[in-house]
Amino acid sequence: MLRWHVRHGTEVGREADRVIRAGTLMPDTTMMRLVGPELAKRRDGDWILDGFPRTDAQAERLHEFLEAEHLPLSLVVHLIVPEEVILQRILERWTHMPSGRVYNLSFNPPKRAGIDDVTGEPLEKRDDDNPETFKKRIDNFHRVTEPMINLLREAPCPLHPDSPLLVDIGGETSDIIWPKLLDVIQQRFRHLQGVKS
C-alpha cells in the first residue's frame, strides 16, 4: 500500500518515501488512515495485512477499528527468518518499479540480468536495499515490533477461541515456510482447503 503511494507521488507517498529511505516507521495515525478505508472496502472478504501493525499504538488503533466495524481478526502470522538470510535477500533483490515485480539473484533471477522478464525494461535496486537501512529496521523491529508480537502471542483468536491468534512460522526459504503457512491458513480458513500456491 505504501509503495503504491510512493509510485504515484501522493502526499502520503512522499512522506513514506522519506521514511522508507531512512529505515524508520511511518506515524501510527498515518498508517491507520491508509489501512482503515482499505479494510472497510473488504469487509465481506478475506484480507491480509503484511507488515502492519508494527507498533503497540498501531495494534491498538487497528483493534479499535476492527471492533467498531465488527471485523474480527482471524490470524496473525509471525514469520521467523534469520537476520542474515533477510539481509542477503535484500542485497540480492532487484525490482521492476512500474509493476512492483521482484526478482532475487539467488532464487528468482530474471532470465536476462537486470531486465524485467515481462516488459524487457530495466530492473532497479531500491534505495533502501542496503545494510545500513536494514540495521535500522532490525533495531526498530526488536525495540518496537517485537514487544507487540509478544503481547499478541497471549491473545485468543476471536473466531477460534481454542486457537491462538498469533502463530510463529520459521524457516530460511520459501519452500520451507510456504507449506507451514499454507497448513495454518487451511486449518484456520476451511473455505481455502483447495489452495495450493
Describe the residue ranges of each PLM region:
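ATP-dependent small-molecule kinase phosphotransfer cores
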Residues: 1-71, 82-88, 126, 133
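Short, flexible, mixed-charge acidic loops at enzyme active sites
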Residues: 8-13, 113-121
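Basic DNA-binding region of bZIP-type proteins
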Residues: 16, 99, 146
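Short, surface-exposed acidic/glycine-rich loop or hinge patches that mediate macromolecular interfaces
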Residues: 25, 52-53, 80-81, 110, ...
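Residue-level recognition of the N-termini of beta-strands and the immediately preceding loop/turn
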Residues: 47, 73-75, 164-167
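Conserved phosphate-donor/acceptor-positioning beta-strand/loop module used by diverse small-molecule
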Residues: 50-51, 69-93, 98-118
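Active-site catalytic pocket residues across diverse enzymes, especially alpha/beta-hydrolases
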Residues: 66-69, 94, 156, 185
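NTP-dependent small-molecule kinase module
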Residues: 122-197
